[in-house]
């Protein structure tokens, strides 16, 4: 890295103490983005409690005695939405039906179109009917920031549709208008935005649908049970719990309410750096932004929570359905035909494996998965031009594009992308402190969180907050000089063994082996137990012996 002789201001101990005890995850001008799976910033105390209660419900399995089944795909939401909790998953479900001269028939009378692959007993099991001529795999979608997505006005989504491709750009996305389950039949249709076919418009509808269809739990919005392969006699024999099975708890919330709270209050995943990457220009240049619309603003309605109302979000989706050519799976849902899919959001993309609705871009590196996913947008359908343009990119342009897409879901300061801000990342921060200028395309941009072109003391305050949030102890001060060890290392102290303690640290009271602020019987016991080893070596000869005992006794008393 380039080095500068004018280094940023050294972080003071007072500033560290201030940011270390911050409850808002902000300090010195740096406000951390929530991690994927965290609650929204700005929730009230009551809303935060609803989020955590909902998260618990989301992860808690149902049993047959509480209504599970008789046929289902999983016993709890987290089993599918697991990366992180509420996010993408690697669990697949199966859709089936008949292709009748180009028209999809869902075989509802035989349990279609969703196969429930599990059952509470062998005798209640559901199978793909022999009549089915269409069988399709669907991967688990993400529930990240559902409340923010739900709050995008219908009119804003509709403003982007161009079903007849009037502008001739090859993109003819359209709104999938649907009726929420909680609305009356005479209510106006809403712009669908959830599900692979945008077949769901509200979070409550999504919760009710998944609760019944994926877990077999009937509820107030879908009070009838799924019969195994449509066999009502088998249903009567297998299902002993009265419907609806989801009833309000002691606080008046049904299960579908609880998981709706959780999904609505999930935060927008991070994007690091937040803007300015050349790869986003490449993304736009090859036409990806025609469908993957970066930015939206949620409605400014008085009925919305403060944490949701009037917020700018960057999901990278238009929430329209598009003809996806060879990616078509032959399944129709609602008004979305066999070739159409909703543009998936891209936030938290870097953690997604597999990619695509059928999981066909899986394994390998992130870059390999992305390359496969983009290539599969062609050679036919609305994504074909972008797929062709991607194939013509230079190696440098591809790298820039991959770096940008990899920023979607990257945590700030997490240089090694292991989902933990720790001493390994601290070493990189210390190196980045010496850089003359940091751009959004530099590796050091992950530490330049306020994007002022320097990794300095302000960014270090944010680093300490991020490390503390991840459960790392940032309070160590080996020489008791008032400057935390992490700050000393950031400012240039060596830490070759990466333990978060400066290698040249001289403890203010080396004979205080127990660290209780005094040299006493406890330290003597430690030394005697370490006799003959290096564990209590005070004179630096590599062994604990008489000379070390003399040093300890000479220092007896308070440090």
Regions found by a protein language model. Name each.
Residues 410-559:
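Cellulosome-associated attachment modules in secreted, modular CAZymes
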Residues 10-21:
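Bacterial N-terminal signal peptides
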Residues 7, 20, 226-227, 512:
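Intrinsically disordered, low-complexity segments
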């Amino acid at each position: 890295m380039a080095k500068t002789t004018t280094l940023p201001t050294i972080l003071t101990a007072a500033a560290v103490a201030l940011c270390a005890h911050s409850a808002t995850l902000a300090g010195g001008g740096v406000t951390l983005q929530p991690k994927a799976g965290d609650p929204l910033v700005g929730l009230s105390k009551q809303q935060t409690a609803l989020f955590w209660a909902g998260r618990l419900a989301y992860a808690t399995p149902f049993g047959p005695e509480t209504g599970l089944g008789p046929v289902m795909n999983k016993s709890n939401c987290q089993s599918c939405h697991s990366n992180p909790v509420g996010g993408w998953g690697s669990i697949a479900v199966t859709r089936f039906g008949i292709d009748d001269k180009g028209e999809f028939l869902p075989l509802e009378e035989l349990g279609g179109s969703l196969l429930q692959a599990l059952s509470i007993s062998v005798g209640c099991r559901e199978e793909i009917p022999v009549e089915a001529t269409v069988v399709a795999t669907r991967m688990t979608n993400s529930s990240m920031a559902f409340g923010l997505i739900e709050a995008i006005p219908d009119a804003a989504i509709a403003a982007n549709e161009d079903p007849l491709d009037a502008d001739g750009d090859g993109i003819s996305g359209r709104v999938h208008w649907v009726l929420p389950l909680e609305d009356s039949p005479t209510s106006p249709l809403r712009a669908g935005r959830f599900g692979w076919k945008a077949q769901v418009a509200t979070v409550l509808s999504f919760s009710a649908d998944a609760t019944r269809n994926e877990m077999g739990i009937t509820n107030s919005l879908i009070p009838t049970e799924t019969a195994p392969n449509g066999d009502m006699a088998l249903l009567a024999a297998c299902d002993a719990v009265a419907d609806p099975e989801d009833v309000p708890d002691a606080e008046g919330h049904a299960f579908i309410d609880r998981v709706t709270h959780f999904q609505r209050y999930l935060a927008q995943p991070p994007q690091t750096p937040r803007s300015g990457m050349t790869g986003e220009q490449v993304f736009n240049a090859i036409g990806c932004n025609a469908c993957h619309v970066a930015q939206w603003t949620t409605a400014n309605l008085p009925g919305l929570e403060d944490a949701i109302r009037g917020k700018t979000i960057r999901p990278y989706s238009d929430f329209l359905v598009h003809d996806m050519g060879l990616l078509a799976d032959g399944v129709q849902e609602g008004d979305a035909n066999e070739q159409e899919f909703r543009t998936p959001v891209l936030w938290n993309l870097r953690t997604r494996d597999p990619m695509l609705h059928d999981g066909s871009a899986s394994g390998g590196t992130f870059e390999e998965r992305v390359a496969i996913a983009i290539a599969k947008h062609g050679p036919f359908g609305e994504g074909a031009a972008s797929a062709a343009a991607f194939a013509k990119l230079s190696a440098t342009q591809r790298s820039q594009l991959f770096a940008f897409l990899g920023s979607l879901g990257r945590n700030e300061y997490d240089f090694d992308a292991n989902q933990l801000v720790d001493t390994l990342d601290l070493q990189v921060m210390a190196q980045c402190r010496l850089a003359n200028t940091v751009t959004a395309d530099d590796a050091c941009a992950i530490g330049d969180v306020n994007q002022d072109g320097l990794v300095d003391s302000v960014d270090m305050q944010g680093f300490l907050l991020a490390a503390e949030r991840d459960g790392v102890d940032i309070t160590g001060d080996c020489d008791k000089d008032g400057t935390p060890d992490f700050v000393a290392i950031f400012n240039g102290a060596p830490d070759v063994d990466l333990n978060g303690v400066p290698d040249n640290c001289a403890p203010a009271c080396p004979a205080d082996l127990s660290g209780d602020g005094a040299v006493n019987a406890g330290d003597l016991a430690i030394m005697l137990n370490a006799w003959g080893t290096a564990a209590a070596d005070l004179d630096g000869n590599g062994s604990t012996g008489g000379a070390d005992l003399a040093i300890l006794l000479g220092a007896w008393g308070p440090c």
